[in-house]
Amino acid sequence: MATVDRWLLPDGIEEVLPPEAARIEIARRQVLDLFQSWGYELVVTPHIEYLESLLTGAGQDLDQRTFKVVDPQSGRLMGFRADFTPQVARIDAHTLRREGPSRLCYAGSVLHAQPRALSTSRSPIQLGAELYGDASPTSDVEVISLMLATLQLADVPDVHMDLGHVGIYRGLARAAGLSGAVEQQLFDAMQRKAVDEVQALTADLPKDLGSMLRALVELCGGREVLAEARVRLGRAPASVLAALDDLLAIADRLASRYPDLPLYFDLGELRGYHYHTGVVFAVFVPGEGQSIAQGGRYDDIGADFGRARPATGFSTDLKTLVTLGRAEVVLPTGGIWMPDSGDAALWQQVCQLRNEGQRVVQALPGQPLSAALEADCDRQLIQQDGRWQVLPLAQ
């Protein structure tokens, strides 16, 4: 084996070195403290588990992003988690089984067989929050607000938000009686804004339904889109009109809380269509081709675990937040150099200093005092007048 093969990492897999690792860890603690202040409880899920459980209710997209291995003990297929949401949904539905709303959060590494885009990591540190047990737009607004608070904590500049609702397309497609194959083709064409293809796929539908489905490609822009949608989708099924009402209620609340936040509406945006059931949202910043935070409603995700519950949530990549954010992360600097000594009094003082939050580095046999500088120490323990004292490091 060539030497280079011993340290070469796979594409999209990276290691994090000091001091960047310290910045990420400090940011993780700050975000989890933020989640806790909003009433969200931390859960820790397995890195790997049986595939049937890991992919339940998650859709085809997650299946394609999941690394799969065979468990040598059981012979069953297992997968490394590519997304926390199915696992957290299982905890809510099967383990906690609470009657009222449940607020849960998480932070940890995930592994992707395929990256979201060519330039993105396959080993992001995913963090997010999920609210179970309430189907109202109020829960969606809470989750979106927490997402924005997370970005504000990291001081990510120039954010703007995209909002959509997969229930609009889903309701029209159901009313049109589209076959699974045609619905998938139309879905693909919608995502590419391929107007000619959408026209061809809806040409044989009843006039009103075909016209409304074609309108989704054009219904994108500022807040005026919602008023226009009310007119162009006025003959839509009740579920579609209810979805528009929910989207308007969410937009009103967000505009009240964040008057300077640019909101963009795209009723043909079907991000997570096989996974989400209602409102979908994503945050973008200039210069980034992918969303930096995203989420939406995924009601009844716990049904396969024996308990269907309304659910809404968001996720983001912690490493991306630290990279894009302007928040100053103050790293601890300096330290105390401890000589190599078996003196019990020295050890007692070192323990006390560490308990007080001081950083104390043990000198190893043969290390000169100059090694203290490499260890980022600016003070040293010196025995004077029969006791150990912390003094400036002798240059």
Swiss-Prot record:
GO terms for biological process: L-histidine biosynthetic process. It is found in: Cytoplasm. Pathway: Amino-acid biosynthesis; L-histidine biosynthesis; L-histidine from 5-phospho-alpha-D-ribose 1-diphosphate: step 1/9. One of its GO terms (cellular component) is cytoplasm. The keyword Disulfide bond does not apply. CDD domains: HisRS-like_core. Its main location: cytoplasm. This is ATP phosphoribosyltransferase regulatory subunit. It comes from Pseudomonas putida (strain ATCC 47054 / DSM 6125 / CFBP 8728 / NCIMB 11950 / KT2440). The lineage of its organism: Bacteria, Pseudomonadati, Pseudomonadota, Gammaproteobacteria, Pseudomonadales.
